Amino acid sequence: MAKPSYVKFEVPKELAEKALQAVEIARDTGKIRKGTNETTKAVERGQAKLVIIAEDVDPEEIVAHLPPLCEEKEIPYIYVPSKKELGAAAGIEVAAASVAIIEPGKARDLVEEIAMKVRELMK
């Protein structure tokens, strides 16, 4: 299956797994925003340290605005394969199209590592 139009770069599986791990750690020791509306607000306000976007969002328009918005605000973003997995990592029982890490807590080093690798992928 072809990647949706909003997916601008390929994310290695292990990096996507690290992103989900960072969401779980930040959920427990820091602060996250769940869902596209909350994520969009966090990006617009410049609060997000890392944005995680699911690749299987339908319709695409729900999250299509996030990559250009993150680029404009210079906030790193990454894709994960499943909105269900992203929701679970965020601690909710439903799927999440996107999540923003506001305060990484104990995931600070992991978030910085992911952000650095994402910048390399985007080149």
Curated annotation (Swiss-Prot):
Keywords: Cytoplasm, Ribonucleoprotein, Ribosomal protein, RNA-binding, rRNA-binding, tRNA processing
SUPFAM superfamilies: L30e-like
Protein origin, superkingdom: Archaea
Molecular function, one GO term: ribonuclease P activity
Temperature dependence: Optimum temperature is 72-76 degrees Celsius for RNase P reconstituted with this protein as well as protein subunits Rnp1-4.
Primary site of residence: cytoplasm
Gene3D superfamilies: 3.30.1330.30
GO cellular component entries: cytoplasm; ribonucleoprotein complex; ribosome
Subcellular location: Cytoplasm
GO biological process terms held by the UniProt record: ribosome biogenesis; translation; tRNA 5'-leader removal
Subunit structure: Part of the 50S ribosomal subunit. May be part of the RNase P complex. Reconstituted enzyme missing individual protein subunits is suboptimally active, showing each subunit contributes to optimization of activity.
Family classification: Belongs to the eukaryotic ribosomal protein eL8 family.
Role description: Multifunctional RNA-binding protein that recognizes the K-turn motif in ribosomal RNA, box H/ACA, box C/D and box C'/D' sRNAs. When added to reconstituted ribonuclease P (RNase P) it increases the optimum temperature to that of the partially purified enzyme and causes a 5-fold increase in apparent Vmax. Binds the RNase P catalytic RNA.
Full protein name: Large ribosomal subunit protein eL8
Organism of origin: Pyrococcus horikoshii (strain ATCC 700860 / DSM 12428 / JCM 9974 / NBRC 100139 / OT-3)
Taxonomic path: Archaea, Methanobacteriati, Methanobacteriota, Thermococci, Thermococcales
